[in-house]
């Protein structure tokens, strides 16, 4: 782990009603890197609370400092220690940022913390097996990123050096961004789905949740069912199709070495 923090260079462009998915597709999804991130708020904006869907954030591959990719996947039991060291590094280092705007993300780390991180602070029974390849914790510092201000219709580009910033701007002006007609994987054919959770197990979980609520142990729970199927579509194509069929008030897409 390196202690060096590099500055960012920012550039402001008109957004022109482009979506997070359009900017992400133009700048980062075609990148040869195995890592890219999209945190997207949709149009139209929430008229009553426009700040709730004001920003989208997208980013590409990790920064490389002193030959080391700025990416972390600590094991369970080490997550909080690694986070504390990273935060201490950031707080103890003053960096002269180049025209850093007031935005929800001005450089730092993108990724996730899985529910299993709770095992670092509580002693809980492990009742379920996790057969997915994704690490319980993953985050990285991107080499470049974009922040979309849907409210002010401003696109902020950020990169580690000015030449990369110019390359991002050139991509924006050269490539077609419209994804509105990309419905190639939406069809009337319904693929067969294999449910990982049985109906009986799901109904039993619902009844158990009701008991917890009645006892005052919890006031809310979110139950889910995992299923799988076979498709030739990429994870990004599936994301676009789902956003078209049923837009979410907030959505995310991660391209990682372990899957999408």
Functional labels for PLM-detected ranges:
Residues 1-260:
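Extended alpha-helical targeting/anchoring segments
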């Amino acid at each position: 782990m390196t202690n060096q923090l590099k500055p960012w260079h920012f550039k402001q462009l008109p957004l022109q009603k482009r979506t997070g998915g359009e900017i992400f597709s133009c700048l980062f999804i075609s990148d040869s890197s195995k890592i890219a991130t999209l945190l997207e708020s949709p149009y139209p904006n929430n008229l009553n609370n426009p700040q709730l869907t004001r920003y989208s954030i997208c980013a590409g591959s990790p920064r490389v400092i002193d030959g080391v990719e700025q990416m972390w996947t600590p094991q369970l039991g080490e997550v909080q220690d690694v986070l504390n060291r990273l935060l201490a590094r950031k707080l103890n280092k003053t960096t002269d940022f180049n025209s850093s705007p007031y935005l929800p993300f001005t450089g730092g780390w993108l990724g996730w913390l899985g529910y299993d991180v709770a095992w670092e602070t509580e002693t809980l029974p492990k009742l379920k097996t996790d057969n997915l390849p994704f690490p319980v914790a993953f985050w990285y510092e991107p080499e470049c990123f974009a922040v979309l201000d849907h409210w002010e219709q401003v696109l902020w580009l950020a990169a580690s050096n000015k030449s990369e910033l110019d390359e991002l701007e050139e991509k924006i002006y050269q490539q077609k961004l419209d994804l509105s007609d990309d419905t190639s994987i939406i069809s009337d054919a319904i693929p067969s789905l294999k449910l990982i959770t049985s109906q009986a197990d799901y109904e039993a979980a619902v009844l158990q949740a009701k008991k917890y609520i009645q006892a005052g142990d919890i006031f809310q729970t979110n139950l889910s069912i995992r299923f799988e199927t076979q498709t030739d579509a990429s994870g990004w194509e599936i994301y676009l199709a789902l956003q078209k069929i049923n837009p979410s008030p907030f959505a995310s897409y991660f391209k990682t070495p372990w899957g999408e």
